[in-house]
């Protein structure tokens, strides 16, 4: 009987973390994303580093601090004392999505900074959540007198007017340039809480776009593997992985993914014909 222990691969470990939405371990799942690039990464050490930051923060907290005081204390600690902020000099560096690098450099992109900030906020018993705002991830906190929306890239709170202005490029063209009050911009629709699974997916898609723009197909495929584990019915991800496999010359894997996409994709998908032609070409090549 073979009793030897085989450590899970990074993808198997990730799959175990994201298999259920009940008690989804957001911080651990996000920390594990770096294991494709840094296979020796100790995820538990990353979690421990965040716990140490929280312990330092909690020692500063007066016993009778209300929610607003806790929020101010958190922002002072995170953005001023520790100096976390956006990486404006190298925004598209993949390390901006890897928590161990963000903790070391104190620089990241909005969504990675938000994950760390939310972990600390929840440790202070603040009702904090992520917001999948178009083009720029936000965080929100529910206070007794209302909701505060914060840009984790800068630490600044945002007014309704500022949010409406940021939303304008994503509005239908006929509403662009119309005052927010006149157009009745549905801000509430864009300020809904982002589920942990959606946060991880957005981070992976950020990495996906970086690797695709650099034509780094090996790293792109590794990201696609995680996206398909995370979102097994996101058929477009099979298509994109299949196209990456085809670029790498992995015909069998490309055919499997592209045929899966064709089988499940809606008939009105605009690229059905193009993908079908590519499948035919790959079959001829493989045959």
Residue ranges and their predicted role:
Residues 1-287:
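A structural boundary/capping signal
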